[in-house]
UniProtKB/Swiss-Prot annotation:
One of its GO terms (cellular component) is extracellular region. Expressed by the venom gland. Residues 22-32 form a propeptide. Contains 3 disulfide bonds. This is Toxin BmTxKS4. Reversibly inhibits potassium channels. The keyword Signal applies.
Length: 78
């Protein structure tokens, strides 16, 4: 049983890291004006603000903050 659980965890982590390596990340920008920061004055967490920026056009994208800068993935489901 422990072997099955360990194998399942290994497979899940492998899939996660494979997907992370496949996704292309692009700097988030508002109206095409440079790279957007994750910091905000809206009392939102950096992750939530970045997620809002990446989905502002209604397209489904992943988002992440790296060193307080927001990055968006390519459109996942056009």
């Amino acid at each position: 049983m422990k072997l099955k659980i360990s194998f399942l965890i290994l497979v899940l982590f492998s899939v996660f890291f494979a997907i992370e390596g496949i996704i292309k990340w692009f700097p988030a920008s508002v109206n095409g004006k440079g790279h957007s920061s994750c910091t905000n004055g809206l009392e939102m967490t950096e992750e939530d603000f970045c997620k809002m920026l990446c989905g502002i056009d209604g397209k489904l994208r992943e988002s992440k903050c790296v060193d307080h800068w927001c990055y968006c993935s390519q459109i996942l489901f056009p």
